Amino acid sequence: MSITLTQLRTQVRNMVDLDETDLPDSIVDQFAREGFQRIYALERRWPILQESYTFNTVANQREYTISTIGDIREIISVVDTSTHGARLNLIDYNEAEGIWLGNLDVASRPYFYSFWDKKLQLWAKPDIVYPMTVRAFRNPVYTWLSNVDEAIDLDEWFHAILPYFIIARVYQRQEDSDLSAMHMRSFDEGVAFARRDLMKASSAQPVVMSGGKQYPTLQRWLQTLGRTL
């Protein structure tokens, strides 16, 4: 069940038996933000952050500011969805700039992408407009701190756990180290259980270790399917 900041404030005060005078909103909100950030510091790929975005390339334009595509934290894949499109391969920027250099930097269909300076680079730079779909993990949203009736941007697993972090900080503020440590352990244990459940591999798609699955190289693709395009 989702929880809002308003509900979180009430829940915490009820659990520690304090009123708004003794535990003002500003303190609860500060601790809530800290616990929220601690959870997101553990993983960059929480399932709740999964998103898909689309954009169109511009002829002869290599770089695209990531923030104009979406509020992206980490890109997983870039796919050219045109008729003869393909999934682009990630390439290191240093390697790419050494290949597409001088007279060799000719505009054509891009097959590679890289990141640098908060921008997405396409290699080669597009010769025409290509529709692209980006699968990515977005950044966490903090609007729940100002819109107190908006659900906190966490998986519901953590909505029941976050109060324990705030309570631990409240008792720490009151210099009650025993109760603070007890509630922090409850928070840490709850987060560990949630993390294990949310991040484990799907039973329908077991983890394949290195060497267990072969992927065609771009060269092989060009020798087979690519030559018929």
Question: What positions do the PLM features span?
Answer:
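Glycine-enriched, solvent-exposed interface loops adjoining structured elements
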Residues: 1-229
